[in-house]
């Protein structure tokens, strides 16, 4: 099961006692700030959680899996996430749910 933005908003509503509308706006604002920073070429560092980094990938040769034809994969910028040590540690200690 995946955590959704709606569930995050509901959790903020229940734990902080703010209105559902404010909780939804807070979640949206958080993600918009992350998006805006990445669009501007900035790294996003969330202490105790991890870092969102930008990586420029060079053009490289590829192959169409259906036809076997060689095709170039164009250069592009990708977002990567590196979890912080605290997050890694907590995930390692967590018991898997079935």
Curated annotation (Swiss-Prot):
Q: Which InterPro entries match?
A: Hist_DNA-bd (IPR000119), Histone-like_DNA-bd_CS (IPR020816), IHF-like_DNA-bd_dom_sf (IPR010992), IHF_alpha (IPR005684)
Record-level GO BP terms: DNA recombination; positive regulation of metabolic process; regulation of DNA-templated transcription; regulation of translation
Listed GO MF terms: DNA binding; structural constituent of chromatin
Gene3D superfamilies annotated for this entry? IHF-like DNA-binding proteins
Q: List cellular component terms (GO).
A: cytosol
- Region ranges (Disordered): 52-71
- Identify the PANTHER family for this entry: DNA-BINDING PROTEIN HU, INTEGRATION HOST FACTOR SUBUNIT ALPHA
- Give the family from UniProt: Belongs to the bacterial histone-like protein family.
The record's note on quaternary structure and interaction partners says: Heterodimer of an alpha and a beta chain.
**What does it do?**
This protein is one of the two subunits of integration host factor, a specific DNA-binding protein that functions in genetic recombination as well as in transcriptional and translational control.
Q: What is this protein called?
A: Integration host factor subunit alpha
Please name the source species: Photorhabdus laumondii subsp. laumondii (strain DSM 15139 / CIP 105565 / TT01) (Photorhabdus luminescens subsp. laumondii)
Q: What is the lineage of its organism?
A: Bacteria, Pseudomonadati, Pseudomonadota, Gammaproteobacteria, Enterobacterales
């Amino acid at each position: 099961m995946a955590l959704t933005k709606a569930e995050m908003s509901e959790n903020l509503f229940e734990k902080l006692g703010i209105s559902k509308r404010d909780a939804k706006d807070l979640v949206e604002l958080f993600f918009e700030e992350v998006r805006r920073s990445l669009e501007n070429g900035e790294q996003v560092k969330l202490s105790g959680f991890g870092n969102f980094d930008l990586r420029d990938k060079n053009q490289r040769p590829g192959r169409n899996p259906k036809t076997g034809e060689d095709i170039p994969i164009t250069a592009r910028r990708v977002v990567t996430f590196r979890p912080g040590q605290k997050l890694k540690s907590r995930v390692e200690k967590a018991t898997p749910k079935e």
